[in-house]
UniProtKB/Swiss-Prot annotation:
InterPro entries: Ribosomal_uS11, Ribosomal_uS11_bac-type, Ribosomal_uS11_CS, Ribosomal_uS11_sf. It comes from Dinoroseobacter shibae (strain DSM 16493 / NCIMB 14021 / DFL 12). The gene is rpsK. PROSITE patterns: RIBOSOMAL_S11. Located on the platform of the 30S subunit, it bridges several disparate RNA helices of the 16S rRNA. Forms part of the Shine-Dalgarno cleft in the 70S ribosome. NCBIfam families: PRK05309.1 (NF003698), uS11_bact (TIGR03632). This is Small ribosomal subunit protein uS11. One of its GO terms (molecular function) is structural constituent of ribosome.
Length: 129
């Protein structure tokens, strides 16, 4: 007997005017999460989900594509203004920020929330190339 197909519920369109864009840019990848003011996720994307693999994930272009993708998804939910929180030392920070502005968001604040260790963990050893 054939099993009944399980129906997937279509994502409901939330109507949120303001949101927070969390841009996490590491040395290897750039992730963008757009949430509401309380922190509930609305849309997200990363350089890896955009189809970039390996060292291409860490490029500014990959970060730009990921930011555009997350921005378009968030606009479907009615987000118009964004507060941007940037974290990490990666090369995709500025390009992701510019891409979010180019999508058409009104950016109200840009905040750097990179954690700074006060002599915490020992850093990784230097690369010998």
């Amino acid at each position: 007997m054939a099993r009944d197909k399980q129906r997937t519920k279509k994502k409901e369109r939330k109507n949120i005017a303001a949101g927070v864009a969390h841009v996490n840019s590491s040395f290897n990848n750039t992730k963008i999460l757009i949430s509401d003011v309380q922190g509930n996720a609305i849309a997200w994307s990363s350089a890896g989900t955009m189809g970039f693999k390996g060292s291409r994930k860490s490029t500014p272009y990959a970060a730009q594509m990921a930011a555009e993708d997350a921005g378009k998804k968030a606009q479907e939910h009615g987000v118009k203004t964004l507060e941007v929180q940037v974290q990490g030392p990666g090369s995709g920070r500025e390009s992701a920020l510019r891409a979010l502005a180019a999508v058409g968001f009104n950016i109200t604040a840009i905040r750097d929330v990179t954690p700074i260790a006060h002599n915490g963990c020992r850093p990784p050893k230097r690369r010998r190339v």
